A protein has these predicted regions:
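Long, histidine/aromatic-enriched segments associated with O2/redox biology
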Residues: 5-426
Length: 426
């Protein structure tokens, strides 16, 4: 089986030696690595490394890669120092792996033969594949069942809410929530899986995997150099998504400002990650006429142009009518209800992926969209928009939300001696 096929491997925890914060990654890649057969994407070689350190975490405005491994973790200790040490170890390991190196300083093959390796080895010989690792904190990290386990309850951001129940939610508790999250994106699925697997290994005894999701075929472009991808309904998805080349809009809608929440000033330069596992009623959709599909979406299926006319990127004319005087873009179409003009100007940076998880006992495909969005404040952005879509969007008849999570993504690591989350625990 070609290694580029999406792997079905889950995360396996094993006892290992964590990479200390002092084990900073060195420039370069492992011996024998080659990116000659890795396709280009977003104007750069897909085998290249993406800088881990910076003002913001990578994996947000980074050009969206083709593959995803997302995992939510529960912290299984109440020891604050152990949690801090883990975040330091994760920072060091993430810095190494995003450069195409092993998770630990010794590697998978060069350690003591009677000790477990400090890397699992499945990415040895592979290029970095533009791997990014993005880490966030869930509401239950701050308080769980009313208990302030780590002395940070008073630093919980007001925007880090417990998401409300939406119509069409059928959330599985086993696919919902989490104290921590890790988003690993790469152009090679084996590289993404390797990243999450090794962070889980390093965290053995401190964290356990609560749930995880593999994704393929990005459903949004986050750069003007990327083409618009298609979702499993067959339509282009994310035509109007925010782009990295729009810094003013990114500042307004994605990055948390220094004055947004005085009690959570540690989040300045960070963002909020909304994750939703959305199952699609694929077989029902496949029996729906093309005309009805396009009416529900509000765009044509080929080019992705709005039904009001023009090309893919032509602004939607919501006032355009047909010969009968009916709106060309239906009042309950997805593109109308999700448009900023009908949501008080709200915009989000979407970074989702398609998924398939086999089939059920009736032979129906378990597939859909793993929705990811980065927002400055979910209370003012995601929640009102999702309420509107769940209530009025006819496309919701073909969708079922089965998993959910909201995470505070702290700013990046750019000062010497800092680590992901250091602003929270200072």
């Amino acid at each position: 089986m070609p290694r580029r096929w999406l792997l079905g491997a889950g995360v396996v925890g094993a006892v290992g030696v964590g990479a200390g914060i002092g084990a900073a990654a060195l420039a370069g890649s492992e011996p024998g690595r080659s990116d000659e057969d890795v396709p280009e994407d977003g104007g750069a070689r897909a085998g290249d490394a993406v800088a881990f350190r910076g003002e913001h975490q990578a994996g947000i405005v980074t050009p969206a890669q083709d593959r995803l491994h997302f995992a939510a973790f529960d912290v299984v200790t109440d020891d604050r120092d152990q949690l801090i040490e883990l975040l330091q170890q994760w920072t060091a390991a993430a810095a190494r792996m995003t450069e195409g190196r092993s998770a630990g300083s010794v590697g998978a093959m060069d350690g003591a033969p009677d000790a477990p390796p400090d890397d699992t080895g499945e990415s040895f010989g592979l290029p970095p594949s533009q791997l990014t690792i993005t880490i966030g904190f869930g509401p239950t990290l701050f308080t769980r069942d009313g208990v302030d386990r780590f002395g940070i309850a008073d630093r919980r951001p007001a925007a880090l809410i417990d998401l409300p129940h939406f119509p069409a939610d059928r959330l599985d508790p086993a696919r919902t929530g989490g104290d921590l999250c890790v988003q690993a994106c790469a152009h090679d699925p084996q590289v993404a899986v390797h990243a999450v697997r090794n962070l889980a290994r390093i965290g053995f005894g401190v964290v356990s995997v609560r749930w995880s999701q593999l994704g393929f075929g990005r459903t949004s472009s986050t750069s003007t150099e990327q083409t618009t991808a298609r979702n499993l309904f067959g339509f282009k998805d994310g035509t109007a998504n925010l782009k990295a080349e729009q810094p003013e809009l990114i500042d307004d809608h994605v990055w948390v400002g220094a004055e947004d929440d005085p009690a959570a000033a540690w989040m300045a330069g960070g963002s909020y990650l909304v994750a939703r596992r959305i199952s699609m009623h694929i077989e029902t959709w496949d029996r729906t006429s093309l005309r009805e599909q396009e009416t529900l979406i509000g765009r044509d299926k080929g080019e992705g142009a709005p039904l009001s006319g023009g090309g893919e990127f032509t602004p939607v004319d919501f006032d355009a009518t047909d010969a009968k005087g009916d709106p060309k873009v239906a009042l309950n179409s997805h593109v109308r209800l999700a448009h900023p003009d009908h949501n008080d100007g709200v915009r989000m940076l979407r970074r989702g992926y398609n998924f398939t998880d086999g089939s059920d006992g009736l032979g129906r495909l378990d597939a859909g969209l793993f929705f990811i969005a980065f927002v400055r404040d979910p209370r003012n952005q995601y929640v009102p928009m999702q309420n509107t879509l769940a209530r009025d969007d006819l496309l919701s008849e073909y969708l079922l939300h089965t998993g959910s999570g909201l995470f505070a993504v702290p700013p990046g690591v750019h000062e010497p001696g800092t680590w992901l989350g250091s602003t929270l625990f200072d």
